[in-house]
Amino acid sequence: FVIYEKGEILNLDEGFGIQLSAYSVFILNKIGFNQLNKNEKYHPSKLDFYSINCNKICDLDLSKFNSTNGKYTTLKRSILIKFLKEKLLSNSIIFHKKIHDIEQINGKININFIDGSSDKVDYLVVSDGVFSNSKSVIEKKIFKPSYYGAIAIRTQIKTQGISNLNSNNISLIMGSDAHLVLYPINQRKELNLVCIIRKKSKDNDPIKTILENTILKENKNLTNLFRGDLKLWPIYTTGKPIKSI
């Protein structure tokens, strides 16, 4: 296989967290994921559901989905990308490639790139995000992302920043127009936090102002979760592709 990347490099900067299902870990273990430094990943055993006031509602036992060959796992995205780059992608990724057009010739898919190069393949999988131009090329139809009416705020914190939640588990805190997901990403007591907030406009309001008018308005005791370096992204969606070639 070959991966054509539209960017010039892989972003290996320290990133936020990612959750991997037990089955995805089972597959990754086939290329050595189980040999990754144990300090760089975590195996939460439960998903705890809370009200906005941090009163526990119920929990889901994630260990029931585990097997001897795969456990539900959390870690930093950057650690996962580095692992994939070393184990899988080092000789299989070509950068700075953007699709100009495609055509089927004698059962093969011919890909023509903007830089004038081309390739013939049996299968083509497009996975370049909501702002994908490749999807428009394949469908021969313009796809314009639309604002979903929500934003995502992300940060990382230490377990010292929480007291009424179980830092060993995944925590889902549900408010009226927002929810928070908090989970450990390694053995060093680092936690990933993502907060999804309904917001009608995508105006660049200060993050603190958005939080004060939404999630913190319902529970000021959550302030400690947002003392770190906060990053905000508006959430976009786009129409689903319908063509298979």
Predicted regions and their residues:
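Conserved N-terminal helical subregion
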Residues: 21-138, 143-156, 203-207
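Glycine-rich FAD pyrophosphate-binding loop
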Residues: 1-15
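Catalytic P-loop NTPase motifs of RecA-like helicase/translocase cores
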Residues: 10-11, 133-134, 232
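Conserved FAD/dinucleotide-binding core of flavoprotein oxidoreductases
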Residues: 58-72, 76-81, 117-119, 160-231
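Generic structural signal for residues in well-ordered beta-strands
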Residues: 1, 93-95, 222
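FAD-binding beta-loop-beta segment adjacent to the flavin cofactor pocket
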Residues: 232-245
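Short, low-complexity Ser/Thr-rich regulatory SLiMs
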Residues: 103-104, 184-186, 239
